[in-house]
């Protein structure tokens, strides 16, 4: 029987770029996904989107094998400073929502 930590999850991350920084934010997200995504244990892929009525908001939806492997990967990424460049590009703190499919 699988536990809650073994269930595949999706993470929806909403990022609002500072005025004039949207292209830089988009490029940074693509670069981080290409460099760190494929080698991350438990990372199943991600797609990036734009919000139609607010083009400064970008959304990334990532698939992970479990909440536990994502938490481990995020702790390591933060320790390594992977997301440090976001500070200069974001108008507000990013928002991350972790979801799983209903049983």
What are these regions (language model features)?
Residues 31-44, 63-97:
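An amphipathic, aromatic/His-enriched active-site/gating alpha helix that lines ligand/cofactor pockets
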Residues 17-19, 66, 100-103:
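Non-catalytic surface loops within mature trypsin-like serine protease
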Residues 16-27:
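Short, surface-exposed ligand-recognition loops at beta-strand->loop->(often short) alpha-helix junctions
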Residues 1-10, 44-57, 82-103:
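Glycine-rich beta-strand-turn "strand-cap" elements at beta-sheet edges
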Residues 8-16, 45-77:
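Short, well-ordered beta-strand segments in beta-rich or mixed alpha/beta enzyme
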């Amino acid at each position: 029987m699988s536990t809650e930590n073994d269930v595949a999850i999706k993470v929806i991350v909403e990022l609002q770029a500072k005025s004039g920084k949207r292209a830089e934010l988009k490029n940074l997200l693509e670069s981080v996904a290409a460099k760190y995504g494929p080698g991350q244990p438990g990372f199943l892929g991600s797609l990036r989107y734009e919000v139609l009525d607010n083009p400064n908001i970008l959304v990334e939806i990532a698939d992970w094998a479990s909440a536990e492997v994502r938490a481990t990967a995020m702790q390591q990424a933060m320790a390594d400073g992977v997301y440090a460049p976001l500070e200069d590009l974001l108008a507000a703190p990013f928002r991350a929502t972790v979801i799983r499919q209903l049983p």
